[in-house]
Amino acid sequence: MSNQLIYTGKAKDIYSTEDENVIKSVYKDQATMLNGARKETIKGKGVLNNQISSLIFEKLNASGVATHFIERISDTEQLNKKVTIIPLEVVLRNVTAGSFSKRFGVEEGLDLKTPIVEFYYKNDDLDDPFINDEHVKFLNIANDEQIAYIKDETRRINELLKDWFEQIGLRLIDFKLEFGFDKDGKIILADEFSPDNCRLWDAEGHHMDKDVFRRDLGSLTDVYEVVLEKLQGLK
């Protein structure tokens, strides 16, 4: 049956469609932090995230990255290939910031000579713990070959994203990705890419991402609108 709610998330709801291999993602006007401990309704956020993520995924598709994105069908809705999500948050860091700086006692804003890929176990009850490759295998999340593919694909995506953001005057500090298995068992990029799941700084070091909400730095939608306008100007 189509249009049945499958899953309710922090930032979007997932619905079935007439095609069993396609789902509809509906972006919400909700901002959260600390795994949902703090929630706020922010009018217009869903529209902006849907537009930004759709634009990024269209460019990734065109660049040969296998993703779940099919098309944006309304201001807040998009169609995606149905995947079985791999319970990993894959974080890539180009610059020290956030939890990385706290964990290792280093200042924010230091360029990393080589981007660092980290894994976090997607489990709200455990507060998404930081894990390594051996934990991933122990938990039967992925094997060696799949882990290597996810890391390589994340680094490839990083190079594309860094270039695009540099072109519009933004520095890509870090980001979180999620992957899933499609109907053929192939690992593809899933979820979203928006300022909700990345850090972006402008030339003056101003936050152009969800840290505006986390750190009470101003209007989240004003910042997201600037990011969208810049991305729309990409060649």
UniProtKB/Swiss-Prot annotation:
One of its GO terms (molecular function) is ATP binding. It catalyses: 5-amino-1-(5-phospho-D-ribosyl)imidazole-4-carboxylate + L-aspartate + ATP = (2S)-2-[5-amino-1-(5-phospho-beta-D-ribosyl)imidazole-4-carboxamido]succinate + ADP + phosphate + 2 H(+). GO terms for biological process: 'de novo' IMP biosynthetic process; cobalamin biosynthetic process. PANTHER family: MULTIFUNCTIONAL PROTEIN ADE2, SI:DKEY-6E2.2. This is Phosphoribosylaminoimidazole-succinocarboxamide synthase. Its EC number is 6.3.2.6. Pathway: Purine metabolism; IMP biosynthesis via de novo pathway; 5-amino-1-(5-phospho-D-ribosyl)imidazole-4-carboxamide from 5-amino-1-(5-phospho-D-ribosyl)imidazole-4-carboxylate: step 1/2. Belongs to the SAICAR synthetase family. Keywords: ATP-binding, Ligase, Nucleotide-binding, Purine biosynthesis. Signal peptide: none annotated. The gene is purC.
